[in-house]
């Protein structure tokens, strides 16, 4: 029985764990991965009752993954897609032609021997993608400047890519980097530069269509190549990768890691024995020379073995090290065993460190034996003497208590070894290893028949050995042989200074005279040490090998390295003694003979060394082997040959990549001799890498053109861009939006809960005081925070003017009418129209002669408006005179008001219901009957003079209540006389002090801070309806109505500049005061 299930998902990314985010990459990350899981039934073991035993698997799953790609998002030149160009400027080689054709449609790892034209293959692929696409980016990356310069020469001098469309990015300066990425199309850079520009937004990863990676065997771990491809792959899977190397890795696991990191779909591997490449290879004669050990070395090895034998036996008895001859102690094995001891937490601390010190001593002896057997007595004694002086000095003053090591270093045999080595090294004519004799013989024989342009490179792993080789060759006193050292930039490790260590840890004394004496002694010794160094430096400069000796001590800077390579190419030096820095990444030039003074177990290093010769002319390789080096070299080369066979047998898991070119189009090869422009061909005559880089930089900046370049304006730096997948919501997303709420029924079924949307007030354009004006109209139910839990948001309704005026106990009450709609929370402003029977006399009698024009408590309010009200009622009318309340002074046509006494109720159900006998008609142009019936607001924003008042209410309010021009905040109003107009109510002493505090904010007067906070607290309690100090002042009186401050609504038609000018100057300070905690 088969069970089949198909799961489709986007490709996984290391830093994107959410499947929803991965799904947003559809448009530009066009890779689609479909995983099919097929379950096959298995035979199961059962008991006598037929029951399946526990742990038995009922089926096994067969997982099949298929990868497909959507059409590319890059813009293509369809008129050029039918052909691809292959330059015939050089000889057409079959293996190059085949690799180019495959690299155009697949991600290829090109692994061919050094000097076989990897640069030409990359240039041809770059040329065709330059022709096929529009506005895309083509990037060549290499770890060193010489390799970048080599590719620039190929692209400009072979393929003819326009120089003004190329750019070189090697320096650390980021000036105009964004502009260069946007204007150019072909780029030559180091991977670190490209990675940094991608992460800071200077380069859009979606624009990359071709990425060429040189020295691709480095694409392991966290190297820049790995991070670069990972970043691009997050946003763009429709791009081509071409990886170049001579040796992909040392084992199959390493090759698979490179394939996975670079998304390789095919490896094109060629060896020196391949049929299609062997005829293009120059002859390289390889000679393995087995050098026996000289008697002096054998004598020292024997004495060293006798001294270490007791320690070795103890390690074997404890099971720390395998039993072997003392001369065969291996430093690497001892180091591995010591690390296992430290990592084992079950071993007691005392036993652990005792065993660790035993293995550490065996490791040191192993290094001594290796140096002695492979490099000679001089290199051995340098290491031995440093370790001997370090331990004896520390043990002598009690800083070390390692008795195991003391039994070895204080052995009488070691004292004899020290005396013997000192005698050998003091003799300048003594050669400490048989390899040195062979080096002299090989050089003498080679230069005796070679021309002036012949060059030799000697490779060695250790700096001490490199300097010894330079001195050995220089002592031949042959004017035709001129050696020099070539090492890295790091300084040489200084030897242990026992004198300084003893002074540092000697008793210092507590008296002042002891301290002064010690400081004087340290200064004298420092001056003496500096003088001695200067004398040694002067002595080195007098010798021919002085520059090599100085380089071995302080390292070689990039400037010194370039100078040495330049002199080597010119012929000033014809023998270069290199460490691993010369194996790859440097354009050293043509070399006729390679001498490998030592060998390694890494086939990559061996192949890189041998690849330095036999490029343009025949070469010779001499391998000097001693001790176990022949077996180690053979094993390394056999393993690499086996690796090549496994790669050829398709033993790797390759990736399925995007073809980019539409499937229906199959470009045909068009071999063509490409005419190179004069400016492009100028790089062909440049041998120096710096000259090529300088020329390419000038081309990038437009300085090669004859016309004077227009000076670019230096504006602000472009802001950092963050590239995100398409359709991704940017910004901060609340956590609640990432969670889906579900409710479960009694049956256990889940259904999503709709998200509740809370309405918000429209953002107002008013000033701070205007917003305070709005706040006075809001009721306790106008804020969702103050509403009870049982209330619905829709039931929260604003208050009308009548509610404000009668806020203390009762509210308006109207009779219900089914024909009139209820006012919703955001209902439009309506005008309540009454009959036109009210007269000015009736209105005057209804005002109860209170002087304020405010209706008494418990009176029912009705409004009478003229039928000819125009749309201009939505705007404020001009200011009225102070005696506007006199009916005799009113003009005809003004609205009249009728007040009727009616008891009020406080029920929640009928507080905002429109009465039945009142007809609703819009007086605002945009306020239609549809707005009233549906409850929709007729506009999204309200100005300063709007709010929830009707036009008639507002007119009444302006004529009777608001003759002043600005808002007055009265936390505790004090009236000088009972029947007073609001216009002439003076500020209380407390409010006046509050205004003075606002005015003092401009001068930053700190004295008022305490008083300011106290008034702030008082104002907030009053505004929110809290208790005040004198609540009796707020109670209604018989001669007038005094309402809380938040109910006082004062308006102005023409604001006067003289009124409260000081208080309004610092609106920001008032905002900070009222909004602070």
Swiss-Prot record:
SMART domains per record: DEXDc, HELICc
Catalytic activity, EC: 3.6.4.12
Example of a GO MF term: four-way junction DNA binding
Span of domain Helicase C-terminal: 511-660
GO annotation, cellular component aspect: nucleus
UniProt KW Membrane keyword: no
UniProt keyword terms in alphabetical order: ATP-binding, DNA damage, DNA repair, DNA-binding, Helicase, Hydrolase, Nucleotide-binding, Nucleus
Family affiliation: Belongs to the DEAD box helicase family. DEAH subfamily. FANCM sub-subfamily.
Subunit comment: Interacts with the MHF histone-fold complex to form the FANCM-MHF complex.
Record protein name field: ATP-dependent DNA helicase MPH1
Gene: MPH1
């Amino acid at each position: 029985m088969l069970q089949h299930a198909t799961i489709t998902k986007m490709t996984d990314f290391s830093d994107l764990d959410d499947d929803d985010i991965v799904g947003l990459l559809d448009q530009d990350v066009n890779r689609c991965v479909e995983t099919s899981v097929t379950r096959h039934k298995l035979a199961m073991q059962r008991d006598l009752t037929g029951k399946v035993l526990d742990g038995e698997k009922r089926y096994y799953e067969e997982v099949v993954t298929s990868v497909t790609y959507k059409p590319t998002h890059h813009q293509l030149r369809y008129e050029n897609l039918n052909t691809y160009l292959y330059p015939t400027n050089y000889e057409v080689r079959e293996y190059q032609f085949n690799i180019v054709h495959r690299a155009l449609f697949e991600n290829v790892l090109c692994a061919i021997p050094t000097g076989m034209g990897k640069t030409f293959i990359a240039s041809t692929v770059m040329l065709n993608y330059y022709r096929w696409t529009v506005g895309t980016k083509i990037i060549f990356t290499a770890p060193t400047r010489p390799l970048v310069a080599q590719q620039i020469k190929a692209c400009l001098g072979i393929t003819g890519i326009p120089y003004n469309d190329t750019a070189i990015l090697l320096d650390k300066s980021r000036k105009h980097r964004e502009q260069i990425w946007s204007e150019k199309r072909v780029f030559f850079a180091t991977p670190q530069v490209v990675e940094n520009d991608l992460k800071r937004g200077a380069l859009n990863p979606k624009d990359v269509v071709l990425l060429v990676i040189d020295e691709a065997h480095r694409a392991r771990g966290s190297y820049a190549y790995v991070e670069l491809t990972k970043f691009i792959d997050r946003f763009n899977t429709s791009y081509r990768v071409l990886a170049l190397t001579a040796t992909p890795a040392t084992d199959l696991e390493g090759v698979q890691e490179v394939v996975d990191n670079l998304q390789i779909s095919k490896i094109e591997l060629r060896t020196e024995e391949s049929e299609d490449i062997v005829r293009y290879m120059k002859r390289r004669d390889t000679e393995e020379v087995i050098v026996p050990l000289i008697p002096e070395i054998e004598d020292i090895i024997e004495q060293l073995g006798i001294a270490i034998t007791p320690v070795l036996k103890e390690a074997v008895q404890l099971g720390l090290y395998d039993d072997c001859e003392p001369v065969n102690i291996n430093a690497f094995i001892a180091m591995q065993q010591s690390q296992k001891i430290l990592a084992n937490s079950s071993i007691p601390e005392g036993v652990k460190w005792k065993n660790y010190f035993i293995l550490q001593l065996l490791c040191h002896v192993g290094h001594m034996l290796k140096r002695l057997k492979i490099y000679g007595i001089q290199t051995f004694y340098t290491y031995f003497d440093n370790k001997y002086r370090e331990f004896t000095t520390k043990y002598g003053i009690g800083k070390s208590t390692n008795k195991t090591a003391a039994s070895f270093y204080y052995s009488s045999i070691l004292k004899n070894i020290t005396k013997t080595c000192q005698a050998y090294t003091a003799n300048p004519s003594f050669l400490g290893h048989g390899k040195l004799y062979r080096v002299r013989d090989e050089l003498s024989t080679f230069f005796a028949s070679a021309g002036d342009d012949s060059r030799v490179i000697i490779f060695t792993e250790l700096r001490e050995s490199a300097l010894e080789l330079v001195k050995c060759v220089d002592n031949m006193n042959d004017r035709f042989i001129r050696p020099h050292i070539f090492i890295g930039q790091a300084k040489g490790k200084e030897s242990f200074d026992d004198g300084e260590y003893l002074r540092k840890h000697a008793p210092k004394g507590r008296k002042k005279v002891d301290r002064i004496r010690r400081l004087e002694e340290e200064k004298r010794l420092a001056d003496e040490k500096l003088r001695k160094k200067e004398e040694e430096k002067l002595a080195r400069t007098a010798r021919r090998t002085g520059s090599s000796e100085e380089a071995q001590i302080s390292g070689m800077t990039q400037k010194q390295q370039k100078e040495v390579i330049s002199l080597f190419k010119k012929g000033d030096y014809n023998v270069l003694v290199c460490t691993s820095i010369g194996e790859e990444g440097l354009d050293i030039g043509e070399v006729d003979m390679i001498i490998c003074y030592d060998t390694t177990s890494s086939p990559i290093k061996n192949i890189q060394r041998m690849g330095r010769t036999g490029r343009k002319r025949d070469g010779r390789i001499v391998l000097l082997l001693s001790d176990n080096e022949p077996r180690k070299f053979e094993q390394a080369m056999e393993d690499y040959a086996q690796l090549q066979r496994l790669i050829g047998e398709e033993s790797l898991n390759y990736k399925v990549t995007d073809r980019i070119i539409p499937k229906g189009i199959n470009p045909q090869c068009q071999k063509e001799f490409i005419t190179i422009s004069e400016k492009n061909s100028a790089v062909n005559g440049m041998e120096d890498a710096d000259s090529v880089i300088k020329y390419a930089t000038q081309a990038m900046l437009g300085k090669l053109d004859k016309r004077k370049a227009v000076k670019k304006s230096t504006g602000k730096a472009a802001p950092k861009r963050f590239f995100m997948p398409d359709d991704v919501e940017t910004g901060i997303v609340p956590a609640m939006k990432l969670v889906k709420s579900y409710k479960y029924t009694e049956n256990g079924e889940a259904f999503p809960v709709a998200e509740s949307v809370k309405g918000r007030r429209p953002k107002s354009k008013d000033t701070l005081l205007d917003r305070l004006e709005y706040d006075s109209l809001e009721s306790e139910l106008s804020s969702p925070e103050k509403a009870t839990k049982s209330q619905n948001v829709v039931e929260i309704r604003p208050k009308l003017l009548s509610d404000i005026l009668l806020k203390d106990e009762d509210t308006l009450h109207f009779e219900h009418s089914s024909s009139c709609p209820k006012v919703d929370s955001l209902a439009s402003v309506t005008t309540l129209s009454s009959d036109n029977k009210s007269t000015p006399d009736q209105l005057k009698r209804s005002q109860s002669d209170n002087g304020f024009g405010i209706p008494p408590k418990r009176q029912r309010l009705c409004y009478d408006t003229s039928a000819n009200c125009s749309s201009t009622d939505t705007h404020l009318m001009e200011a009225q005179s102070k005696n506007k309340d006199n009916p005799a002074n009113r003009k005809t046509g003004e609205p009249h008001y009728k007040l009727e006494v009616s008891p009020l109720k406080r029920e929640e159900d009928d507080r905002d219901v429109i009465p039945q006998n009142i007809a609703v008609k819009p007086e605002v142009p945009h306020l239609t009957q549809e707005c009233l019936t549906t409850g929709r607001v007729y506009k999204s924003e309200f100005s300063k003079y709007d709010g929830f008042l009707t036009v008639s209410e507002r007119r009444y309010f302006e004529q009777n209540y608001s003759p002043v021009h600005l808002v007055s905040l009265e936390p505790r109003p004090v009236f000088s006389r009972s029947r007073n107009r609001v216009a002439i109510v003076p500020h209380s002493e407390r409010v006046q002090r509050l205004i003075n505090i606002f005015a003092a904010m401009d001068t930053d007067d700190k004295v008022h801070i305490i008083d300011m906070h106290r008034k702030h607290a008082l104002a907030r309690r009053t505004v929110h309806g809290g208790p005040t100090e004198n609540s009796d002042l707020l109670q209604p009186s018989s001669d007038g109505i005094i309402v809380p401050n938040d109910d006082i609504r004062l308006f102005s038609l023409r604001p006067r500049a003289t009124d409260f000018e000081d208080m309004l100057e610092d609106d920001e300070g008032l905002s900070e005061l009222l909004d602070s905690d």
